[in-house]
Amino acid sequence: MSRSLYNWLYRDTLSSRGRTALLFGGVVILVAAVVGGTWYYFHAKAVEKEEQARRAALVLQQKRTSIHNFYTTALKGADVRGFLALYTEILRSRQPIELAGFREDSFSCTTESCSFSYLAGQNTVFSVQDKYFRNVSYAPSFSQESVDYTGIPSGMSSNPVLEAFNRQEKISEPTCNDILNYVYSYNSLVEAGQRFTLTTLPASSVSADEEALPGNPDNHGLLAGKWQVSLPDNYVTVHAFWHNRPYSSSFIFQSVAGKQGILDISGTLLCKK
């Protein structure tokens, strides 16, 4: 009887202790889960915030890069002085080859390089000779009837506006209304063969980016269009056309090509909004 009572009491005690242990263990697990969940929540929030900041910084950097690339592309080229210096060298360098009996068929220059093609005359004794351009000699490639020179540096990749941009200095250009009024007025007064053609009106692909980054040093609020003009291939006409041209700093020269006595000149037109 006493042993049965003892066993019953002992069993009850063990059951109570077990329940206490289970309850304690459950509390510990619950607390751990709450703490772990809380840590995970705030850690996840911190990671998400860092990712948002990283993405925002990346977007801003992409905007800065877009602005920089827009201006370096639009501003790359020569100013009037640089273009006239290049054209003078083109005229000078063609003379020795023409004296040897070759006729310049065509040439073209970009902001990077120039190429020239010469045809042999009917009574020309075919001989290969180098082309001297800015006191540097360039060997040709040739066929039975022509002599070609390629890869000659044009020296037409820089100008004062681009240099000011690279120094992060202020760039002052006329308003688009002023320069467009000038171009249209000029075109109305001259023959069709000497008119400016605006192949692309001034615009900007980065205006919104500049507004989003008001303190960006590359911001200048400029618009860029494309112009083209055709002129006779002779120094007097070309020099007279560009000498003392109003708004000359707004004309960036990026290409010149000559064929059959005509020059096609083109580039970027700069102006303020």
Language-model features: locations:
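Periplasmic/lumenal scaffold domains of single-pass inner-membrane subunits
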Residues: 44, 58-60, 64-65, 85-273
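Short extracytoplasmic/periplasmic juxtamembrane "stem" segments immediately C-terminal to an N-terminal membrane anchor
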Residues: 49-69
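N-terminal positive-inside, membrane-proximal cytosolic segments immediately preceding the first
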Residues: 1-32, 37
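N-terminal cleavable signal peptides for secretion/export
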Residues: 70-89
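Generic signature of intrinsically disordered, low-complexity segments enriched in small/polar residues
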Residues: 9, 43-44, 73, 121
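Transmembrane signal-anchor/signal-peptide helices with a preference for the extracytoplasmic
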Residues: 33-54
